[in-house]
Amino acid sequence: MKCPFCGHPDSKVVDSRPDKGGAVIRRRRECEECARRFTTYERVEEMLPLVCKKDGRREHFDRMKVVSGIKKACEKRPVSVEDIERMADRLETRLQECGEREVPASRIGEWIMNELHAVDQVAYVRFASVYRSFKDINEFMVELQDLLKK
C-alpha cells in the first residue's frame, strides 16, 4: 500500500482487526521507507446492479437517495433512523441477491413501498403519492382504498 506521507509503494501491516461487525477490516500499516504509520480499511466490493430510469438513463444505485426519500416519507412519523437504515440495508441485500446487472427504478420503488407499508402506513401513502405521481384525487383515493382493504 502506497504511503500517504512519502509516497513509497511498500508498507507492512502491524495490526489488523475486524471493524463494524466484521464488515470491514481495519489495518495499521507502517511505511518501509519513512516508518510513519497510517490506517487503511478493507471491505468487500459491493456489486450492485445499475438502476434503469423511466427515461432510459442508467445510474449507479445511490443508497443516500433511497434513505433521503424514505426519510421524507417518514417525516414527523414514529419511525426511527435505525428503522430507515434497516430498510435501506434490506433493499441493498435484495439488490445484491437478485443477481441482475440492471434493475428498473420502478421495481426498487415497489420494494421501498412494501418496506414502508410494513413499518408505517402514513409514510407508505406519502411515498406512494410522490412515487406513483397520481394525476388526480381519484387515483389517490383508489390507492387509499386498496391500503384499507389490506
UniProtKB/Swiss-Prot annotation:
Q: Does the keyword Manganese apply?
A: no
| GO biological process terms, semicolon-separated | negative regulation of DNA-templated transcription
**Cofactor binding description:** Binds 1 zinc ion.
Q: Ranges for the ATP-cone domain? A: 49-139
Q: Does the keyword Ribosomal protein apply?
A: no
Names of the cofactor(s): Zn(2+)
This entry's Gene Ontology molecular function terms read: ATP binding; DNA binding; zinc ion binding
**Zinc finger (unnamed) stretch:** 3-34
Tell me one Pfam family matched here: ATP-cone
NCBIfam families reported for this sequence? transcriptional regulator NrdR
Q: Which PANTHER family match?
A: TRANSCRIPTIONAL REPRESSOR NRDR (PTHR30455:SF2)
Q: What is this protein called?
A: Transcriptional repressor NrdR
Protein source organism:
Trichlorobacter lovleyi (strain ATCC BAA-1151 / DSM 17278 / SZ) (Geobacter lovleyi)
Classification from the root reads:
Bacteria, Pseudomonadati, Thermodesulfobacteriota, Desulfuromonadia, Geobacterales
